[in-house]
Amino acid sequence: MAERNELHKRNRHNGQYDFSRLTEEYPPLKKFIVLNAYGTTSIDFFNPRAVKALNKALLISCYGIRYWDIPKNYLCPPIPGRADYIHYIADLIQPDISDESTGLKTAIPNARQYRCLDIGVGANCIYPIIGQTEYGWTFVGSDIDPVSIDNARKIVTCNPALAHKIELRLQRDSRKIFEGIIAPNEYFDVTLCNPPFHSSKEEAEDGTLRKLSSLKGKKVTKARLNFGGNANELWCEGGELRFLLTMIEESRNYRKNCGWFTSLVSKEKNLGKLTAKLKSTDIAEHRIIEMHQGTKTSRILAWRF
């Protein structure tokens, strides 16, 4: 497989996957190993069962997570990109200590226990898993879906290293983000979120079809589409923009409860309206942090009061 270049320097997934080691750690991955168009060992990334097996192998090999599973048709996230978000958040909240020879931050913020809130933790619980195992952070993960909460809780209870480090809370009002989750006297160093991208199921399906058609170089039809992700993981009324505008507005009421508010922004065109909203809000600072994975660029929007 081609190298996944430009990941964060602390990301364990820089370079090529070591499939020999991964299949040794998780033998069920072997049946999904293929030779790609470049003649190198890989898997079929359009096969959700193969991606799920790869995730299990990576979680065992890199993070010591022996049990991880998700319900059928729930989002199976690419772990390298999820890890990047965690590492860039670490840079955001750690003391500004730099290596004189490279100018790069080298300190890892595990001197004290940081507390994080993951909005939309999902059934996969990936951000809390990586944040806890890499940095020792504790997490609260919220979600509007009871199945996701129950599955994430099972992952935590089945891995002793995560026990008492990750708490799951059900958001009972789908119109709210922080309200009903953050208690009045509770404090988080940072909040994370990977919001739903799309405004409807149809838009989500069409977007996935276009992406797959582009990657495969030929038209992909709905009959051939393996659509990964539950409804609330992929779309919400008003899409990403409305969700994040609501988040910014709600964050004003929790300025004393959170050090940094952050979210991924998948659509670059939304940044203009989001930054305008932030500038009209009495924040102290906002940042846009770019992340690179091969030819893909994604962004973290961060702000604090």
UniProtKB/Swiss-Prot annotation:
Subcellular location: Cytoplasm
A GO cellular component entry from the record: cytoplasm
Main location: cytoplasm
Biological process according to GO: rRNA base methylation
UniProtKB keywords: Cytoplasm, Methyltransferase, rRNA processing, S-adenosyl-L-methionine, Transferase
GO molecular function: 23S rRNA (adenine(1618)-N(6))-methyltransferase activity
Keyword flag Cytoplasm: yes
Leading EC class: transferase
Reactions listed under catalytic activity: adenosine(1618) in 23S rRNA + S-adenosyl-L-methionine = N(6)-methyladenosine(1618) in 23S rRNA + S-adenosyl-L-homocysteine + H(+)
SUPFAM superfamilies: S-adenosyl-L-methionine-dependent methyltransferases
Its EC number(s): 2.1.1.181
Entry annotated with the keyword Methyltransferase: yes
A Pfam family: Methyltransf_10
Domain of life: Bacteria
Family assignment from sequence similarity: Belongs to the methyltransferase superfamily. METTL16/RlmF family.
Task of the protein: Specifically methylates the adenine in position 1618 of 23S rRNA.
Name recorded for this polypeptide: Ribosomal RNA large subunit methyltransferase F
